[in-house]
C-alpha cells in the first residue's frame, strides 16, 4: 500500500472512531509473570469486520535476543464471527503509528517544513520517517 494511501486510511479511521462510526474500546492489560498482555479490540461498522490485536511486552526478551514487543492481529467477519485473517501485529502497529505521524504532520506542520529529527531507531522508526517524507519536502 502506498504510504499516502495508508496515511489517508488512518486519518479516516481516526475520524470514524471520533465520530462514533467505528468503535475502538480502551485496551485491556493483563499482567503476566515476565511482562504484560495487551488486548485491543476494534469494530468497523457497516459489516466491514472486527479485530483484536494481542500484544505481549516482555522486557527480558532483549537479553534472549528476541523482540520485547510481539503482536498478532485477528481479523473477524463482523456478520458471521468467523476468523478471516491472522496478521503480523508488530508490522501493522509500526505502519499505523507511522501513518498517524504522517497525518499529524500533514495537519500540524508548516507546508514548507524541510528538516526532520528522528529520535530512536526502534521498530517503528522507518515508518515514522516514510510517513513524514510522504507529506513534507524534507531535505535534511
Regions from the PLM with identified roles:
Residues 1-94, 102, 112:
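N-terminal ligand-binding/catalytic initiation module
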Residues 1, 136-140:
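Short, intrinsically disordered, charge-balanced linker/junction segments flanking boundaries
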Residues 98-101, 109-135:
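Glycine-rich adenosine-cofactor-binding loop
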Amino acid at each position: 500500500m502506498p504510504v499516502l494511501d495508508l496515511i489517508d486510511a488512518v486519518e479516516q479511521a481516526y475520524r470514524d472512531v471520533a465520530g462514533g462510526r467505528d468503535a475502538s474500546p480502551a485496551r485491556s492489560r493483563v499482567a503476566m509473570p515476565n511482562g504484560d498482555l495487551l488486548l485491543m479490540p476494534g469494530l468497523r461498522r457497516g459489516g466491514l469486520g472486527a479485530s483484536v490485536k494481542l500484544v505481549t511486552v516482555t522486557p527480558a526478551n532483549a537479553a534472549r535476543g528476541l523482540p520485547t514487543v510481539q503482536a498478532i492481529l485477528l481479523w473477524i467477519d463482523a456478520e458471521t464471527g468467523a476468523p478471516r485473517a491472522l496478521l503480523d501485529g508488530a508490522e501493522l502497529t509500526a505502519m499505523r503509528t507511522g501513518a498517524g505521524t504522517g497525518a499529524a504532520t500533514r495537519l500540524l506542520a508548516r507546508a514548507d517544513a524541510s528538516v526532520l529529527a528522528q529520535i530512536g531507531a526502534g521498530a517503528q522508526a522507518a515508518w515514522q520517517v516514510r510517513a513524514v517524507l510522504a507529506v513534507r519536502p524534507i531535505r535534511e
